[in-house]
Amino acid sequence: MKQFIDFIPLILFFIVYKLEPRIVELAGHSFTFGGIFSATAVLILASLLVYGTLFLIQRRLEKGQWITLLACLVFGGMTLTFQSETFLKWKAPVVNWLFALGFAASHFIGDRPLIQRILGHAVSLPAPLWTRLNLAWVAFFVFSGCANLFVAFTFHEFWVDFKVFGSLGMTVLFLVGQGVFLARHMHEHSTESAAKSKD
């Protein structure tokens, strides 16, 4: 569920991006609404609202959420300041690669891989499987970052569509794959444990 909360600002960004730019008057001021720059402003405001609400409810944000929020503020802010969408195109690759770096670094920092620290309270697996699972997340984030970068700078007309639906689709497929992997190995692990207890 937490992964999909991150997509709320992105979906609002997509909706505004697809609007035909038009002049809107508000409180005596007129401005253009629709297109990439209006969508970027909505992305920033929606991110602040979503993560601000989560912070008030939970009294904290996870590190990944802080990274996503800060990246949105930095890259979105530069996009609006310099009126160039190039900065925003780098946001998804950089965020994904930072996540990949965090998962990879956990093999050398701390006593457990990062995915085990996240899921270890609910799932029991042998250490080698936790390592494989963690490396799968590293590979996913590296691939996702590269895919976003390639599409953003190769297919200009479709990069926003891919940013929303491509990223969401890849995430859903990967999570389903992870669920199948966990279910299969949890069953094997519980069967082995039961057999050992009988011995």
Swiss-Prot record:
The gene is yciB. Plays a role in cell envelope biogenesis, maintenance of cell envelope integrity and membrane homeostasis. It comes from the Bacteria. This is Inner membrane-spanning protein YciB. Belongs to the YciB family. The chain crosses the membrane at residues 4-24, 36-56, 64-84, 90-110, 135-155, 162-182. One of its GO terms (cellular component) is plasma membrane. It is found in: Cell inner membrane.
